[in-house]
Design a protein with these regions (language model features):
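Common nucleic-acid-contacting/processivity interface regions adjacent to the catalytic cores
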Residues: 1-79, 85, 89-97, 195-250, ...
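Glycine- and acidic
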Residues: 41-50, 157-170, 185-202, 221-237, ...
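Phosphate/diphosphate-binding loops
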Residues: 91-132, 299-335
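Non-transmembrane amphipathic alpha-helical segments
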Residues: 173-190, 209
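Active-site palm subdomain of RNA-directed nucleic acid polymerases
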Residues: 244-271, 283
Length: 404
C-alpha cells in the first residue's frame, strides 16, 4: 500500500471505531482545480551572518489540523474565494506567474484579510454546508465569528470549522501523537540502559509514527484520496503561513522591539522555521563591552528569545482564528540551532556552523561545530570524493572566517 492508501485506511478505521459511516469514494471531475498554496519560504538576506539562531514549530501541519479541528465533517462553511481566485487567475494568465509565484509573499486569501480587517466595503459570499448561502460584509462576518460566542474557527483560507465535536482526522492525529510520545519514552529508556538492539527497535517504531503524522496532510491533499478536500489542504498551508509569520515577527519584536516578520533580526524563513540574529542589533553594546558575548551567553539569550515568542501563540491563535486555548495548546515552538556563522545564498540554499542543536553542543572534541548545509550539493554522487571533500573544507573555511 502507498502512503495515500495507508492514510486513507487509517482514517476509515478511526471512523468505524467511532461508529461512523464513511462515504463512498466520490467521482472527481478531471478538470477540477486541485492546486493549493504551498508552504511559506522567504527570500533570505543574502550573505554571511554571525551568531544565528533558529526557532522551529513542532509538527506544524499536523498541529494546525488539530488546532483548527480540520475535517470534512467539521466544516461549517466556506467564504467563496472570488477575490483570491481572480487574483491568481490574473497572475497566472496576464502576468505569466506560476501558481506558486502567485502566492509569493501571501499569508492568507484576500477574503480572510477582509474579515480580519473588519472591512465594511467588501461583500463576502459564504456557502454553508447546510445548503444556505449568505452575503455579508467582512465586518459583519468578523462579528459573527469572533463576537457572537459561536463555536466557530476561521482558517486563513476562509474556511469555517466548528469546535463542537472533534473531527476524525484531528482525533487520529492526536492518537498518533500520543503513541509516538510513548514510543519515544521507550526509546529513551533503551538509550539510558545502553541497549543498542532495543534502541534501534524503538527508534524505528517512533519513526514510523512520525512518518504517519507528517504524511497525512499530503495524503488528504491528493485527489486520489477518498477524503481529499482542497479547503482543508489550503487551510492547512495558509494557516501555517500565518502562524510562521507571527512567530518570525514576534522573535524580531523580542530582539528589536518591532513586530515585523522581515525585520532587522530576521535572516530567513522556511516552512516551519525562522532564522534570526541578535548580533546586528546588539553589536555596539557588544563591542563596547556592555553586553558580555560568548557561546554560552548566546545560547542562553536565544533560548530566552524563543521562550518569550512561544508564550504568545495562545493569544495569537484566539485573535487570528478564534481558536480556543483547549485546541491552540498544540501550537508550540522551540529553539532549534545556534550557529556561530551562516551563509545564505537563496531559498533552500544555505549553510551554518552549528554549535548547539536543541541543547546538544556540537563544538566538542576540538571541533568548531557541525556544518549544516542545505541545497549546496556538497555530496552529489556524480562528484568525485576528493572534490566533495575540497568543497566541504572550503565551506568550513568560509564559515570559520579563515583565509581561503
Amino acid at each position: 500500500m502507498g502512503a495515500v492508501a495507508v492514510t486513507e485506511q487509517a482514517i476509515v478505521n478511526e471512523a468505524h471505531h467511532r461508529g461512523m459511516q464513511v462515504p463512498n469514494r466520490p467521482k472527481r471531475d478531471d478538470g477540477e482545480n486541485t492546486a493549493a498554496a504551498g508552504a511559506y519560504v522567504a527570500f533570505p538576506k543574502k550573505g554571511l551572518h554571525k551568531w544565528i539562531g533558529s526557532m522551529d514549530l513542532n509538527s506544524l501541519y499536523p498541529s494546525v489540523i488539530r488546532a483548527l479541528n480540520m475535517d470534512p465533517a467539521t466544516i461549517i462553511g466556506q467564504i467563496r474565494p472570488d477575490i483570491s481566485e481572480a487574483r491568481v487567475h490574473e497572475d497566472t494568465t496576464l502576468k505569466k506567474k506560476s501558481f506558486a509565484g502567485s502566492w509569493e509573499g501571501k499569508f492568507a486569501v484576500e477574503e480572510y484579510d477582509a474579515v480580519m480587517e473588519a472591512r465594511k466595503d467588501v461583500a463576502l459570499t459564504v456557502d454553508f454546508e447546510n445548503g444556505n448561502t449568505e452575503v455579508v460584509s467582512g465586518a459583519e462576518l468578523n462579528k459573527i465569528i469572533f463576537d457572537s460566542n459561536k463555536p466557530w474557527m476561521l482558517s486563513s483560507n476562509g474556511t469555517i470549522f466548528t469546535t463542537e465535536h472533534e473531527g476524525v482526522i484531528p482525533g487520529l492525529l492526536k492518537r498518533w501523537y500520543s503513541e509516538r510520545k510513548e514510543l519515544q519514552a521507550q526509546l529513551k529508556k533503551a538509550k539510558d540502559a545502553g541497549n543498542a538492539i532495543e534502541t534501534e527497535y524503538w527508534d524505528k517504531r517512533q519513526l514510523v509514527k512520525k512518518i504517519n503524522l507528517n504524511s497525512l496532510y499530503g495524503a488528504i491533499l491528493n485527489p486520489g484520496c477518498r477524503f481529499f478536500d482542497k479547503r482543508i489542504g489550503q487551510s492547512t498551508t495558509l494557516t501555517g503561513r500565518t502562524i510562521v509569520k507571527h512567530m518570525s515577527a514576534e522573535v524580531n519584536k523580542v530582539i528589536t522591539g518591532t513586530y515585523d516578520h522581515v525585520g532587522e533580526a530576521m535572516i530567513y524563513g522556511d516552512t516551519d522555521s525562522c532564522y534570526f540574529s541578535a548580533y546586528p542589533t546588539l553589536k555596539n553594546d557588544i563591542d563596547s563591552g556592555k553586553i558580555p558575548w560568548s557561546k554560552d551567553n548566546v545560547i542562553t539569550l536565544y533560548d530566552q528569545v524563543c521562550e518569550a515568542a512561544n508564550t504568545t501563540f495562545e493569544k495569537f491563535m484566539l485573535q487570528a482564528f478564534h481558536c480556543p486555548k483547549t485546541r491552540s495548546e498544540v501550537i508550540a515552538a522551540g529553539r532549534e540551532i545556534v550557529a556561530e556563522s551562516g551563509l545564505y545564498i537563496t531559498k533552500k540554499r544555505y549553510a551554518a556552523l552549528v554549535i548547539d542543536n536543541e541543547g546538544f553542543r556540537t563544538d566538542i572534541d576540538g571541533k568548531p561545530g557541525k556544518v549544516k548545509a542545505m541545497g549546496l550539493d556538497l555530496r552529489r554522487s556524480d562528484t568525485p570524493v576528493f572534490m566533495q571533500e575540497f568543497l566541504s573544507e572550503l565551506l568550513l573555511m568560509v564559515l570559520t572566517d579563515k583565509p581561503v
